[in-house]
Amino acid sequence: METIKTIARIRSDFPEKFGIPRQSGVVPETRAEIVFEKPYQNPDALRGVEGFSHLWLIWGFSACERDAWSPTVRPPRLGGNARMGVFATRSPFRPNPIGLSSVTLEEVRLHTPEGPVLVVGGADLMDGTPIYDIKPYLPYADCHPEATGGFAEEKRHYALTVDFPAALEAQIDPAHRAALRGVLAHDPRPSYQSDPERMYGVAFAGKNVKFTVEDGVLTVRKIEEIS
């Protein structure tokens, strides 16, 4: 039993890897839709799911597949310099490139032209990512207040102040502004890049958001349409 079937695809505002939150839940304002593949569009498969506030998503790192794997990786949390064992990290570069995300269940749409759709919050998945399974989050079993977090013990708060000129922010759909600010505040740059003169771009919700970072302040410089 080594065959894993894709039961659904995620529809998110992230068309590429750069800019996606590094963990699920750190930008709770993001919204995504889970659209089921035809063999799994029976609404009965979702009976009772509306009673849960959170879900576990099991999915594939479809944009990070490699022929070979390395026993050690460089976690962004450690600045991209120190190496840790792959099984002590959540790196996408694994023997089996499978991801696990905890998301909030925002809405259940059982009857749409595409079949059942789940709207979720806080997802850290690129648009089109294959979903292999969905399970309910069970607080009594899944929450461990006494847990320790190893090298990722410290909870990270927003690292950057976001300077978003009003004229540029007005080009963003109001429904996406809070999520975009959260994405930018979490510093989407690679940990090894800190050139204040460099212009970066995050593709989000149909826009390419260009920005620079200096002295802890991220300044949005330009908004471009993604064709």
Regions picked out by a protein language model, each given a short descriptive name:
Residues 1-98, 110-227:
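Mixed-charge, low-complexity intrinsically disordered regions
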